[in-house]
Amino acid sequence: MTTDTIVAQATAPGRGGVGIIRVSGPQAAQVALEVTGKTLKARYAEYLPFKAQDGSELDQGIALFFPNPHSFTGEDVLELQGHGGPVVMDMLIKRILTISGVRPARPGEFSERAFLNDKMDLTQAEAIADLIDASSEEAAKSALQSLQGQFSKRIHTLVESLIHLRIYVEAAIDFPEEEIDFLADGKVAGDLQAIIDNLDAVRKEANQGAIMREGMKVVIAGRPNAGKSSLLNALSGKDSAIVTDIAGTTRDVLREHIHIDGMPLHIIDTAGLRDASDEVEKIGIERAWDEIRQADRVLFMVDGTTTDATDPKEIWPDFIDRLPEQIGITVIRNKADQTQESLGICHVSQPTLIRLSAKTGQGVDALRNHLKECMGFSGNSEGGFMARRRHLDALQRAAEHLLIGQEQLEGYMAGEILAEELRIAQQHLNEITGEFSSDDLLGRIFSSFCIGK
């Protein structure tokens, strides 16, 4: 339970029609009394003067008091809504700080107190910052879903399933004299597989949510002179890369951060992949592969004037064999202005094929729409939940321990090891919602918030 009271401006710094000062803690009611000159009625908006220590008026506006526990932080909360000039806001905060027991809030401290007082879990607290920082309607929808608890519900469902399975497994361990072999009756294996399948579905949606938040990493790869740099320029809308007819012009990695309808993408142009004798080009090609291995999606560039093939395994089997399985691939047949091919997307099973001309820009809009779809943009959906890198890491660790437990069950009927792996997996899932989190982790998360949130 906190004993100090915090204050900060809740609205963005700068000039505005309205500025809001937020106060939270046991001294909030005293602050209201000293600044407004009266005891405020709970959850009732009153238009009042805001007074300095000598009784002179600093400003006038709306005062709202929310007694605990029915407030954002779960503590007594006061909001003063005055004129939004920076001087006025600063004068009000300085006035409030003259009252004993009040100090300036740290970044994210209001949300941190809401979390510590069980007003929201950790994913919901993080969703507040994500909603504020959303760069597209789709990202805002996803952040709102997390704020409303959609992500948390999925995690809680997994945790509940793990708890029930742990009870069953540990009962089998504790009561070995029972005639029924609980570990071999099929229920444990079936329930464990159902949890793994459910976790895989959550991981897939969380990965989509992380892309929505952090942006999708798209690597343009292919042989020299396929038009990779021209495509980077076409997508970024500027001449980021040097374009010539000389194969191997690009020898290093080029990056551009762009937005498509507000959705962030990190576009990376790489050196043409081939067996190079030049030492500098070799380094560039190895860097290209480093980027490819970390990509969310690879745009496989093909010079349409050199082949009629559309299957990347036929065009370049060595490249496909070396490409990690989890990375999505889109085949780009470039130079359609010369081959006179029909432009746009052609879904020939998988991967997706797009015909375009990077030089003229024809067909590039089809690629932009395709990339939006890959990021989860639908235009009319409610949006999935938002996720962060730490969520993905925790989900992955949980999945790894479940798979270890499954191997021990299937191979050795090792109930004790399975029970321990289930416990560790549950612990990793609890880290996501904050039911098990170190103080250091909480400090890092909330320090990234705005002051006043």
Curated annotation (Swiss-Prot):
Its EC number is 3.6.-.-. Transmembrane segments: none annotated. This is tRNA modification GTPase MnmE. Its cofactor is K(+). Binds 1 potassium ion per subunit. Exhibits a very high intrinsic GTPase hydrolysis rate. Involved in the addition of a carboxymethylaminomethyl (cmnm) group at the wobble position (U34) of certain tRNAs, forming tRNA-cmnm(5)s(2)U34. GO terms for biological process: tRNA methylation; tRNA wobble uridine modification. The lineage of its organism: Bacteria, Pseudomonadati, Pseudomonadota, Gammaproteobacteria, Vibrionales.
